Structure formats: structure tokens, C-alpha cells
């Protein structure tokens, strides 16, 4: 009997292992051959790199229950107010009025209120930020592909999603960044649409994205429409098509005009005009310049881009990270220039379209750089704080448009290796983000602990005396933490005063004087006699030993919980009554008068007998 075939497959023979190893080598050889033939597309490499990098940049969002952001708690408080507009028992009704409308900043509030109907505000905001982080490189890749560029550099948009605007709580500005990229991509695809049907559909899509950008943020809307017009004008399409494509921006401009004409001016200020805005901008920019030379000031701002773009952490780790990110961008530029001389097919009209889009990308980059260099740091009259630094993110995003299209000429293993620098950087920086976000979560764990022990349904006020963070490099980043109370303890009666109500871009206005609630910026001005009739809970952080917030009313409050530097006090039920005056001390009897003892006369000195004296005299 021939059993050789059976023996060849026995484990002891070792031949099965050899065949498996040979099969594995064949698979690797075929894969390498497939890569070397140039069949690996740029889109395929980007998709694989995107899926590999995505978990590293979503993980930080789950490292802390409350995401960092200076203004974020105030926005969530405003969203809580909007969700209760029209309710007869709304705790905000006696003090605030407002509602959703066509205006900048509205997109974030619309998303929060809509998602808040099926989930909590904290979960809704975290979902929005997840979409934002995941969408940034996708929008960048769409723009690069529309400009006939490689999509792979778009992987560098992942770390740029964690930028200054996100950590400062400028959520609307941050959310508008991928929408700017999306608008430029849609405008480019619109002017180059090949069929009438595709042009009509693209026109509707571009108009919708422009409206979305307007209700996200005003500054990026103005930049985005100017950049998209440059992309339309510099395209290879006819002037008639360029004009019709540009008309897709008209609905968004109509929304801008409606908002500007129907919004009342800020209390105490004249109605904003172009001349007045220019006056404010010029004055504050010259104040920033001071006695320095223009060349020194501009160069100093350029050197500050790494400190501004990805700003977030006290240890300054974001600065070398941003420099490393920029070096990878420069490396992609150099590789693209070198690969440009490689042999490849030239098809019309792609070379002309690539040259035109390269010019459009340069215009977009220079526009973002001009905004960063020309705008002032603060523009209080127009409700703009930390103004020019926020455009540093846009400068780096637009720099990706300068990467030559020569990357598309790479073939074989070069294409597979192209995403590796971005992936390695993303993995390292993603882990760093996770550690910092986890440390921030530990820092605010004391507030979460006392908030969870605070009953829902009350009106709360925060008194943060030390608002500095040991993790986040953002001024006063902890000042708004008490405003998370309605999101952490949701109920019909839960309320905190939404800050910034009354500003033109905010969806709420005060019906009473602002002094009805102590400003979070002035905790030392807290007056218990004025605040106790309105508020039920008081979150206090780092109370100074020399300041007694409940002076004269200690009998009206009681400690609910304390954890770390945080404490929460509850107002006792009943009428507000001040502490009784301290009992008068018992009168101290006057000390008895001390009478000096009468002097005692010394005993008389005995004298000699007279007779004796006389006898002697004789």
C-alpha cells in the first residue's frame, strides 16, 4: 500500500510546514509585485492610513468625562437653555430669552439641541467632536483630490484637529475648519463638472456647504468665500461657468445680510459699520505693534505659529510636535518636487488644471497667512478674543495645498511608504494627547465627584477662585467648570447662568440686569444677600482662607460634598434670614480701686535723759 501521500502531511514529517512557509512567501512576493506594478492607488493608501490613524485620535475623547475648553461649559449651558425655551416651568424664563435662528455659531447649538433630544448634552457634544476629528482629514483629502494632488498628506490634518480653538472652547471656529476645506473642494468640483446634471447637483451642494459654513462661524465664512472665489476664478472653466458657480455663494450672503440687519447692536455700542470695524481693527493692531518694527513683529508672529497652532498643554509638548509636523509637510513638498521629474503619462487637461489649482492653493495659503499676520490679538468691540492666533491652524492646513502633485507619480513601494511618516507621527502624538486628556480628567475629578452628589433640578452658581489648570495651557480654563452642572445633572429645573448672553452671535439675551448673578470672572464680588434668593447650589473651588463667601448668612447654607479643591454648598429651605448678631459679651466688672496703704511713721528715736546731760554739762 502506498502511503507516501499521507506521510507527506503528517506533523512529524515537516513537509507541511515547509509548504505553509512557501505559501506565505508566495503571498508576500505577489503583494510586493502588486505594489511594484503601480496598481496601489493613492486613494487606497490614504484609506488604509486613515483607518489606522483614526483610533489614535478618537481615543483622547474617551480619556476624560468632561472635555477641556474655556468657553465650552458656557456653550453647553446656553444649549440647555435653548432646549427649555417655551417650557412653562423653564428655570431660565425669568432671566433669559432667546432661540435658534440664522446666525453664526448656530450650527453647534442646533446640533446640541437636536442630539440632546435623544442623548445627554455631554454625549451629544462628544459625538460632535468625534465627527469633527474624523472629518478633518477627509475634508482635506477631498480638497487635495479636487486639486489633483495626493490625498496622503491629508493624514497630517488629524493632529491639527486638536488645536488652539478646540482647547480654548472656540467650538464653532473649530467646527468650521473642515467645512472651509469642504467648501473649497465643492467649489473646485463644481467649476470642473463635466455634465449639466453634475453641475446642477454640485451647485446645490456648494450652496448648502456655504450656508453651513456661515452658521458655523463668521470669520471662517468670510475667509472661505474669498478663497472659494479664488478657486473659481483660477479654474480652467469658462468665465460664464465661473460666474454661475460663484452664484452658489449668494444664499449664504443673503443669510449674512439678514443676520446683520436684524441683530441688535451690543448694549452700549453703536451699530457696527464697515468704517467702525476698520477703526477698531486698525487701533488694536497698532496697539499690538507698540514701539516694535513691522518686520520684527511679523517675523515674531511667524515664529509663534508652533506655539499657537496646536496649543494645549502646560508642559509645552505641543510646540515640538507642531515643529515635527511642519517638517513632515516640508518633506512631502521636497519628495513631490523630486518625483515631478519621474516619467509618467501627461493627459490633458490635467496639467493645466493642476497648475491653476496650484495657484489657487497658493492664494488660499497667502490669505490665511495674511489674516494671521494682520489681525490684532484681541478685538473686544467686535466680541473677538485671541483673534489672530486662531488662524495659525488655517495657515498649516492651507500649506498642505502647496505639496506638489508629483507625489502621484510615485509607484511601487514608494507609494506604500509615503503614509508612514504621517502614521508614525500620528501614533506618537495620539498617545501624547491621550495622556494629557487623562491627566486633565484626573484634575477635574473633584468637581465631577461633588456634582454627582448634588441633587438635580436646582439653580447653581460657580465661584472659582483659582482658575488655572496644571495640564491645559489655556488662561482661566477652569473658570466655567461649574456650568457643566445642567449637563451632568440634567433635569427640568437644572440651571446655571449662561455666560456671554447678549452678544450678537449668541442665541440668548438677558431680561434682567446682568448683576442678578455673580460674574464667574469676579468671584470676590459674591454677595450672599443678593445671590441666596435666586440660587440653590454654590460650587466653590480653592476658597481663599481670608475670604468668607457666606459672611453673615452661614445659617442659610450647608455643605453638601467636598472633594479635593472643590466643595458644593446648598441653600437651606425657608426665607432668607441673616445670621443673628453675636451675643453681646457679659459686662466685665470694673476693677476695684487700688488704695495705697497709709504710710507708717517710723518709731521715734529714743533721746538721752536731760538730767544726765545737765550733769555732764556741769
Language model features: what each stretch is:
Residues 127-147:
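Transmembrane-helix motifs of polytopic, lipid-linked glycan transferases
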Residues 405-431:
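Signature aromatic-anchored transmembrane alpha helix within multi-pass, membrane-resident enzymes
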Residues 168-176:
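Short acidic/glycine- and proline-prone juxtamembrane loop motifs at membrane-interface regions
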Residues 77-84, 96-121:
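Short hydrophobic/aromatic helix or loop-helix immediately within or flanking a transmembrane segment
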Residues 28, 140-162:
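Transmembrane-helix signature of polytopic, membrane-embedded enzymes
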Residues 64-74, 86-89, 96-97, 210-363, ...:
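Transmembrane catalytic cores of multi-pass membrane glycosyltransferases
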Residues 450-543:
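Short periplasmic/luminal acceptor-recognition loop of GT-C membrane glycosyltransferases, typified by
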Amino acid at each position: 500500500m502506498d502511503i507516501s501521500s499521507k506521510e507527506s502531511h503528517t506533523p512529524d514529517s515537516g513537509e507541511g510546514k515547509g509548504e505553509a512557509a512557501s505559501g506565505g512567501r508566495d503571498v508576500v512576493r505577489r503583494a510586493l509585485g502588486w505594489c511594484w506594478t503601480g496598481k496601489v492607488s493613492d486613494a487606497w493608501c490614504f484609506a488604509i492610513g486613515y483607518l489606522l490613524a483614526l483610533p489614535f485620535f478618537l481615543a483622547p475623547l474617551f480619556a476624560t468625562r468632561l472635555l477641556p475648553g474655556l468657553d465650552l461649559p458656557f456653550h453647553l449651558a446656553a444649549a440647555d437653555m435653548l432646549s427649555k425655551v417655551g417650557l412653562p416651568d423653564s428655570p431660565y424664563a425669568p432671566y433669559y430669552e432667546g432661540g435658534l435662528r440664522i446666525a453664526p455659531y448656530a450650527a453647534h447649538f442646533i446640533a446640541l439641541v437636536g442630539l440632546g433630544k435623544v442623548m445627554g448634552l455631554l454625549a451629544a457634544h462628544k459625538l460632535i467632536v468625534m465627527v469633527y476629528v474624523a472629518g478633518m482629514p477627509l475634508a482635506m483629502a477631498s480638497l487635495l483630490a479636487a486639486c489633483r494632488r495626493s490625498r496622503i498628506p491629508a493624514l497630517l490634518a488629524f493632529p491639527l484637529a486638536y488645536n488652539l480653538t478646540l482647547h480654548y472652547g472656540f467650538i464653532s471656529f473649530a467646527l468650521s475648519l473642515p467645512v472651509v476645506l469642504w467648501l473649497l473642494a465643492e467649489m473646485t468640483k463644481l467649476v470642473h463638472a463635466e455634465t449639466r446634471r453634475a453641475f446642477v447637483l454640485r451647485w446645490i451642494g456648494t450652496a448648502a456647504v456655504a450656508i453651513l459654513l456661515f452658521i458655523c462661524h463668521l470669520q471662517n465664512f468670510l475667509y472661505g468665500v474669498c478663497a472659494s472665489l479664488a478657486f473659481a476664478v483660477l479654474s480652467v472653466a469658462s468665465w460664464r461657468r465661473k460666474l454661475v458657480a460663484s452664484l452658489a455663494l449668494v444664499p449664504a450672503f443673503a443669510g449674512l445680510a439678514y443676520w446683520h440687519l436684524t441683530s441688535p447692536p451690543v448694549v452700549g455700542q453703536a451699530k457696527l459699520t464697515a468704517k467702525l470695524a476698520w477703526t477698531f481693527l486698525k487701533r488694536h493692531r497698532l496697539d499690538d505693534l507698540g514701539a516694535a518694527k513691522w518686520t520684527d513683529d511679523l517675523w515674531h508672529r511667524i515664529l509663534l505659529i508652533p506655539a499657537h497652532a496646536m496649543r494645549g498643554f502646560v508642559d509645552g509638548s505641543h510646540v515640538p510636535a507642531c515643529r515635527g509636523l511642519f517638517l513632515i509637510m516640508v518633506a512631502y513638498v521636497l519628495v513631490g518636487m523630486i518625483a515631478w521629474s519621474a516619467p509618467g503619462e501627461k493627459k490633458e487637461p490635467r496639467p493645466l488644471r493642476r497648475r491653476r489649482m496650484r495657484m489657487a492653493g497658493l492664494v488660499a495659503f497667502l490669505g490665511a497667512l495674511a489674516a494671521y499676520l494682520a489681525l490684532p490679538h484681541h478685538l473686544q468691540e467686535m466680541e473677538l478674543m485671541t483673534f489672530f492666533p486662531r488662524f495659525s491652524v488655517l495657515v498649516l492646513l492651507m500649506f498642505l495645498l502647496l505639496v506638489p502633485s508629483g507625489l502621484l507619480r510615485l509607484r511601487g513601494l514608494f507609494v506604500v511608504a509615503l503614509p508612514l511618516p504621517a502614521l508614525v507621527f500620528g501614533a506618537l502624538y495620539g498617545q501624547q494627547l491621550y495622556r494629557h486628556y487623562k491627566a486633565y480628567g484626573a484634575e477635574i475629578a473633584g468637581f465631577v465627584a461633588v456634582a454627582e452628589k448634588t441633587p438635580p433640578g436646582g439653580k447653581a452658581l460657580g465661584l472659582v477662585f483659582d482658575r488655572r489648570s496644571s495640564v491645559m495651557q489655556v488662561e482661566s480654563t477652569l473658570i466655567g467648570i461649574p456650568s457643566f452642572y445642567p449637563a451632568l445633572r440634567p433635569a427640568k429645573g437644572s440651571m446655571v447662568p449662561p455666560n456671554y448672553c447678549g452678544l450678537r452671535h449668541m442665541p440668548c439675551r438677558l431680561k434682567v440686569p446682568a448683576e442678578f448673578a455673580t460674574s464667574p470672572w469676579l468671584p470676590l464680588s459674591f454677595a450672599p444677600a443678593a445671590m441666596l434668593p435666586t440660587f440653590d447650589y454654590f460650587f466653590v473651588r480653592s476658597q481663599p482662607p481670608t475670604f468668607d463667601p457666606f459672611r453673615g448668612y452661614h445659617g442659610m447654607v450647608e455643605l453638601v460634598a467636598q472633594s479635593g479643591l472643590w466643595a458644593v454648598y446648598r441653600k437651606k429651605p425657608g426665607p432668607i434670614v441673616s445670621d443673628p448678631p453675636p451675643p453681646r459679651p457679659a459686662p466685665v466688672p470694673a476693677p476695684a480701686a487700688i488704695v495705697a496703704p497709709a504710710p507708717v511713721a517710723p518709731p521715734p528715736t529714743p533721746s538721752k535723759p536731760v538730767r544726765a546731760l545737765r550733769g555732764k554739762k556741769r
